[in-house]
From Swiss-Prot:
Region span, Disordered: 1-23
Listed EC numbers: 2.7.7.7, 3.1.26.4
Pfam families reported in the protein's UniProt record: DNA_pol_B (PF00136), DNA_pol_B_exo1 (PF03104)
Protein name: DNA polymerase catalytic subunit
Any one cellular-component term (Gene Ontology): host cell nucleus
Catalytic reaction annotation: DNA(n) + a 2'-deoxyribonucleoside 5'-triphosphate = DNA(n+1) + diphosphate; Endonucleolytic cleavage to 5'-phosphomonoester
Function description: Replicates viral genomic DNA. The replication complex is composed of six viral proteins: the DNA polymerase, processivity factor, primase, primase-associated factor, helicase, and ssDNA-binding protein. Additionally, the polymerase contains an intrinsic ribonuclease H (RNase H) activity that specifically degrades RNA/DNA heteroduplexes or duplex DNA substrates in the 5' to 3' direction. Therefore, it can catalyze the excision of the RNA primers that initiate the synthesis of Okazaki fragments at a replication fork during viral DNA replication.
Similarity comment: Belongs to the DNA polymerase type-B family.
SUPFAM superfamilies documented for this protein: DNA/RNA polymerases, Ribonuclease H-like
Nucleotidyltransferase found in the keyword field: yes
Annotated source species: Elephantid herpesvirus 1 (isolate Asian elephant/Berlin/Kiba/1998)
Alphabetical GO biological process terms: DNA-templated DNA replication; viral DNA genome replication
Length: 1041
């Protein structure tokens, strides 16, 4: 197929003359104002060239499809993409036309202007903007009156029942906040002055002041107070007024609550769900959105349909971009560099029900055919970006996904739009929409946190989802799809892309197929992990948008729920100033009694400990007693909590006032129980997924309540609540331990509470029940001398039931979590054991569980640990050895069974020094948490590898990736690891020697740390002791290059 570049003469493939133009081509503008900067790789007309051709062009931007030019402005005007009525999809056929097609005429509206019909529609996102009445003269007065002179409009984005994209503009939702009034006249006077100053700054807005009686959520109170309620038609002006009043030291309440949150909370609406709409007004012209159907209504016209949980068939799109660096060394591209251009963009379009998939590729220059892919050729990067954005606008995806798109693809597209002065927000669901990216602070736990906003579209980055949901050695796309899908990416390296792209049409097709395949894989991950269902369940429960679920964390979820609950009780939430520096002690860990236990150890676990503490002790902002109210309450009305720091917090009991947090938790837990019951009897596969995600959302939200109160920089922190929760948790652990140690060593008592133990054989010399460890919400109970294991295990539920009934107020409950048949308890947070009924080991905090340990060390250490539990000879030997004194070791020697364990280590050393260990088993890794130059400590092995890759002009890893490296042989045995770190692929290719001494030392260290309790107490350096037990042998020194 010939490709004609209308801006540069071609002596290559194709004609010098343009294809026959359509009638729409007659409209040309060549004014300087309409000219755009055309950047074109010279390779598309002169193969293998690395130059860029630049000139200003006054022609209309266009793309080429099937050799025919298509003007982009005509596509946008008629909302018609050139691909339509295409049956062929991925070399197969589908019923109907390509789902990219939008009709070129106005959609058949289900209603007419001002008629009495009802529209049923589903929403997934809300957009908020301010409007001026002079711009909406065409609207009926019932809507326009809310815009005088300016007003807030909430646009609900979704679909009607027949699948039509809809934007419902809701009028009449005011923004408001409260001001505490000590002196009403003085307060009103101060407000008037603030508003007068704002008017001078041209902030036109109507507002109303009225006195209301409310109670603050913060602190127990029995009397209402007078507050000034400030109601604004324009929320931007309202927020500015609140800030000015705060600066004047007025106490402000709820000024950070957004209008769409007010809309949802005040009217008990739903952020993700179905609505019915009475008497809508249909916008035929002057639309604010790019949706097919746009309606206007008042708040009172809407009715939420809470019983409906099904989804309309939303449109989705996975995309990926490929870039070309303009630097001589093909360095990693940077959007701010004018010569680092986007060369290809792939889009895979599919519906939420996953019934159809179409594949599209936008490319610079001509491209050979790729089976099943629609190819759109562009002559310049400007036209490539415009074509892609036009495609997004015409297709109108509701969900956009990709892999690392938040940190790279979307910011890169936005950066190039900024370079060309393209208003990318106009291509969103809203005509005055936003397409922005904010890069937040980087940290180890929140790598490269980028918040992306595309008005009316949900952004789900599968890289972030996989980071949270998938445990993998690294989270590169190739690794994740191999684990989850059993598939591989196309084998095109970063360095091959420029070479292939510059070569010819076929080379660009190889790069294009690679680009499209990445989007296909992301589509499959999207449908595999189903995070959109989980996010929608959380959004629905918390009354926030899905995008807030994705980007804003747990704080906004709990705050919105609390706002709704407080409103029902007539309480208002104070706006918190910058939090103080006070801290509190976190969860308790009981000091472990380390050792190897060749006897059952039961783990008793508190069910939902922190939520149940909040419920049991009525902890809340509104039940917290301040000094002013202590004297007016009786002792029996108060729960006192004393912390380890000596601070005392007091809360009223439920009969005085019920905790709002407790009510929320009780409601959520009851709902979760009901949902799980429904799930047991559900037969529909999709409904099973929805119910499962709903119960998971309820669980996650319950567990987030405690954290919400304890984050000092959060939306509404309360140190007293967070500190009281952990203090009560410590008390519960201590009481449980004391009760078990005091009462459970009486065999008669045990048979009374657990009839299963009657007539059970017991070794009176060995009988002992003790708590050997406690961690946050669980206790480890040693059970010695009870010889019938089956009876013992069947008695455990009675043990915890008795403890719960005797010690704890409801709903605090102790449960049997698991039972270890053998346990190696190393220290706090570190143990390994064999669970009853299972053969595999259960570990926590052991070196071989961590990802920065190589496979050789991990597997050998695991083999040694397994031998402790599977080989009785070794088990008995190490148990005996752990209790030996120095004199006993000198006289008797070490138990023979211990040397069976040593033999495993000796064999591993032989394989290592004889080069029988695969290099991939020797890989170490670390996460690149930030750019190399931002590290305070530069002498780190993984940074050495990144720098070496840069020097060799290899593909550079992204922030958040795990960097793999191996340690090379070196004449100095004490050389630092960062000096000898190297990329494993490079080592394998060049057959470099491995530093066997380093790896064997790491092995010895890992094993000693993992089994340290088996060594006698008099041994101060177990690693040296273990090394001395391994027979010595001399190996040839490596030949260094």
């Amino acid at each position: 197929m010939a490709f004609f570049n209308p801006y540069f003469k071609s002596k290559n493939k194709g004609s010098d003359m343009p294809p026959k133009q359509s009638m729409s081509f007659t409209k040309q503008h060549k004014t300087k104002e309409s000219a755009f900067l055309s950047i074109t790789p010279e390779c598309i007309i002169k193969p293998k060239s690395s130059k860029l051709l630049k000139k200003y062009n006054g022609e209309q931007p266009r793309l080429f499809y099937n050799g025919e030019p298509v003007l982009l402005y005509t596509v946008r005007e008629i909302s018609q993409w050139p691909v339509k009525d295409i049956m062929k999809v991925n070399n197969g056929t589908v019923d109907g036309s390509c789902n990219v097609v939008s009709t070129s005429h106005e959609p058949d509206s289900p209603v007419k202007n001002n008629c009495e019909e009802t529209v049923v529609f589903h929403i997934y996102e809300q957009c908020v903007f301010c409007a001026h009445d002079v711009s909406y003269e065409y609207l009926p007065w019932r809507y326009k009156r809310f815009l005088s002179p300016t007003g807030t409009i909430i646009s609900l984005i979704g679909k009607t029942e027949d699948g039509t994209d809809v934007c419902v503009n809701v009028h009449g939702q005011a923004y408001y906040f409260y001001v505490a009034m000590k002196d009403e006249a003085a307060t009103r006077d101060a407000v008037s002055k603030v508003m007068s100053n704002l008017e001078k700054e041209s902030s036109s807005c109507s507002y109303v002041m009225k006195s209301v009686n409310k109670m603050s959520l913060m602190g127990f109170n029995t009397n209402t107070s007078s507050y000034l309620m400030m109601i604004f038609s324009n929320h931007f002006v309202g927020k500015e007024a609140a800030r000015n009043l705060k600066d004047l030291d007025f106490e402000i309440f709820e000024h950070l609550v957004e209008p769409n949150t007010r809309f949802l909370v005040d009217n008990e609406f739903c952020s993700f769900g179905w609505y019915s709409l009475k008497t809508p007004y249909v916008r035929q012209t002057s639309k604010d959105s790019n949706c097919e159907l746009e309606l206007d209504c008042c708040v009172g016209d809407l009715q939420v349909l809470r019983d409906r949980v099904d989804w309309p068939n939303y449109k989705c799109m996975a995309f990926d971009i490929e870039c070309l660096s303009g630097s001589v060394d093909d360095a990693f591209p940077d959007a701010t560099n004018p010569d680092d251009i986007i060369i290809q963009i792939s889009c895979v379009c599919f519906d939420i029900k996953n019934t159809i998939e179409t594949q599209h590729l936008f490319t610079l220059g001509s491209c050979a055919e790729i089976p099943g892919v629609y190819i759109y050729e562009c002559a310049s990067e400007y036209e490539l970006i415009e074509s892609f954005l036009t495609f997004v606008r015409v297709y109108g995806p509701n969900f956009i996904t990709g892999y690392n798109i938040n940190a790279f693809d979307i910011p890169y597209v936005i950066g190039r739009c900024r370079y060309y002065n393209i208003q990318c927000g106009a291509f969103t669901k809203m005509k005055r929409g936003r397409m922005t990216c904010f890069k937040g602070m980087e940290s180890f736990l929140n790598r490269c946190q980028c918040k992306v906003t595309i008005s009316g579209i949900v952004i789900i980055d599968m890289y972030r989802v996989c980071m949270d949901k998938v445990s993998a050695p690294n989270h590169k796309l190739d690794t994740v799809v191999d684990m989850l899908l059993g598939e591989k990416k196309h084998s095109v390296s970063y360095k091959q892309i420029p070479v292939l792209f510059r070569r010819d049409d076929d080379g660009r097709a190889v790069v294009g197929a690679y680009c499209v395949h990445d989007s296909v894989l992301v589509h499959k991950l999207f449908c595999k992990l189903l995070f959109h269902y989980e996010a929608s369940a959380i959004a629905r429960l918390s009354n926030i948008s899905i995008n807030k679920v994705v980007f804003d964390g747990q704080q906004s979820r709990i705050f919105t729920c609390m706002l709704a609950a407080a409103r029902r009780e007539g309480l208002i939430i104070p706006s918190i100033d910058e939090a103080g520096e006070d801290t509190y002690q976190g969860a308790t860990v009981l000091e472990p009694k380390t050792g190897f236990y060749n006897t059952p150890v039961a783990v008793f676990d508190f069910a939902s400990l922190y939520p149940s503490i909040i419920q049991a002790y009525n902890l809340c902002y509104c039940t917290l007693i301040t000094d002013n109210y202590v004297a007016s309450l009786r002792e029996e009305d108060i729960t006192m909590v004393t912390t380890n720091t000596g601070r005392v917090h007091r809360f009223v009991k439920p009969h005085v006032r019920k905790s709002i947090l407790s009510q929320l938790l009780t409601s959520w837990l009851a709902e979760r129980k009901a949902v799980r019951e429904k799930l047991k009897h559900c037969k529909d596969p999709l409904m099973q997924i929805l119910l499962d995600k709903q119960q998971l959302a309820l669980k996650l939200t319950c567990n987030a309540v405690y954290g919400f109160t304890g984050v000092s920089k959060g939306m509404f922190p309360c140190l007293a609540i967070a500190e009281s929760v952990t203090a009560q948790g410590r008390q519960l652990l201590a009481v449980t331990k004391q009760y078990i140690c005091d009462r459970f060593n009486d065999w008669t008592f045990l048979t009374q509470i657990a009839p299963e133990l009657v007539d059970c054989p017991v070794d009176s010399n060995r009988f002992k029940i003790d708590v050997v460890y406690g961690d946050t919400d669980s206790v480890f109970v040693l059970l010695c001398g009870i010889e019938n294991a089956d009876r013992l295990y069947s008695a455990l539920p009675n043990f915890v039931a008795h403890i719960t009934k005797t010690l704890f107020p409801p709903p605090i409950k102790l449960e049997v979590d698991k039972v270890f048949e053998k346990l190696l308890l190393l220290c706090k947070k570190r143990y390994v054991g064999v669970l009853h009924g299972e053969e595999k080991l259960s570990m926590k905090g052991i070196d071989l569980v961590r990802r920065n340990v190589c496979g050789f060390v991990k597997n050998t250490t695991l083999a040694v640990i397994k031998s402790l539990f599977s080989d009785n000879v070794i088990s008995e030997a190490v148990q005996k050895m752990s209790g030996m004194t120095q004199d006993q070791v000198c006289k008797e020697g070490l138990p023979p069974g211990f040397f069976k364990l040593v033999a495993l280590i000796t064999d591993a050393r032989e394989r290592l020094y004889e080069n029988r260990v695969d290099i991939h088993e020797l890989q170490l890794s670390a996460t690149l948490t930030q750019a190399c130059d931002k590290y305070k400590q530069q002498n780190l092995p993984h940074l050495t590898v990144v720098r070496k890759k840069l020097e060799r002009r290899e593909e550079i890893p992204n922030t958040g990736d795990r960097i793999f490296y191996v340690l090379l042989a070196h004449p100095d045995e004490r050389v630092a690891n960062y000096v000898i770190a190297e990329d494993p692929d490079y080592v394998e290719t060049h057959r470099l020697q491995i530093n066997c001494s380093k790896y064997f030392s790491n092995l010895i260290s890992s094993i000693t740390h993992s089994i340290s309790p088996i060594f006698p107490e008099f041994i101060s350096k177990p690693d040296r002791f273990l090394m001395s037990c391994v027979p010595r042998k001399t190996y040839p020194k490596p030949i260094l290059n």
